[in-house]
UniProtKB/Swiss-Prot annotation:
Its main location: cytoplasm. It catalyses: GMP + ATP = GDP + ADP. This is Guanylate kinase. SUPFAM superfamilies: P-loop containing nucleoside triphosphate hydrolases. It comes from Pseudomonas putida (strain ATCC 47054 / DSM 6125 / CFBP 8728 / NCIMB 11950 / KT2440). Residues 6-184 form the Guanylate kinase-like domain. Its EC number is 2.7.4.8. One of its GO terms (molecular function) is guanylate kinase activity. ATP binds at A13, P14, S15, G16, A17, G18, K19, T20. It is found in: Cytoplasm. NCBIfam families: guanyl_kin. Keywords: ATP-binding, Cytoplasm, Kinase, Nucleotide-binding, Transferase. The gene is gmk. It comes from the Bacteria.
């Protein structure tokens, strides 16, 4: 493990844009990246695991954590609450890992105020038609829910210009390569390289 601290990344997207699939593929290829496990009050979906996908808690417990100041950010989405543990986040960064927060624009605004050094990425679908097709293809939700999420997606996408990077997920492999490029280019910044290779640089140039 290197001696440089990790970078905090915010990754946001409307539901159905492919954010989760892209982040999953990214972390499989890069062992230096971790994904923050958020707390949520929503019901567990088939295939999900407590402590892996989310920390699933009841509303009363979530409100208690807010009162204790345990969340870096928290937001309400579709009637459910989501929040990010402040202490767990900092511990991961201190270990030298890059950390991804998969949060919406509301959470992103909160995080930027407290950690302005965070880099942010917004993932867009190629069109509203493609987004609706992806939502329909899930087969998990009713037409009413899909219509509501389409409306919510538009209100989410309005905030794309608040982010440092924008990736359009038309072709998955291309979008994944773009996401990898964001992480790799940041690691090559002068400050990061000076931290990572301090001993080597001192040996070469004194």
């Amino acid at each position: 493990m290197n001696h440089s601290s990790g970078t905090l990344y915010i990754v946001s997207a409307p539901s159905g844009a492919g954010k989760t699939s892209l982040v999953t593929a990214l972390t499989k290829d890069d062992q230096q990246i971790r994904v923050s496990v958020s707390h949520t009050t929503r019901a567990m979906r088939p295939g999900e695991q407590h402590g892996v996908n989310y920390h699933f808690v009841v509303h009363e417990e979530f409100k208690a954590l807010i009162a204790q100041g345990d969340f870096l950010e928290h937001a309400e989405v579709f009637g459910n609450f989501y929040g990010t543990s402040r202490s767990a986040l900092q511990q991961t960064l201190d270990q030298g890992y890059d950390l991804i927060l998969e949060i919406d624009w509301q959470g992103a605004q909160q995080v930027r105020k407290l950690m302005p050094q965070a880099l942010s990425v917004f993932i867009l679908p190629p069109s509203q038609e493609a987004l609706r097709h992806r939502l329909d293809g899930r087969g998990q939700d009713s037409e009413e829910i899909i219509a509501g999420r389409m409306k919510e997606a538009v209100s989410e996408m309005v905030h794309y210009d608040e982010y440092d990077y924008v990736i359009i997920n038309d072709d998955f492999d291309t979008a994944l390569a773009d996401l990898k490029a964001v992480f790799r280019s940041n690691r090559l910044l002068l400050k990061k390289q000076q931290q990572r290779h301090a001993a080597l640089l001192k040996q070469m140039i004194g």
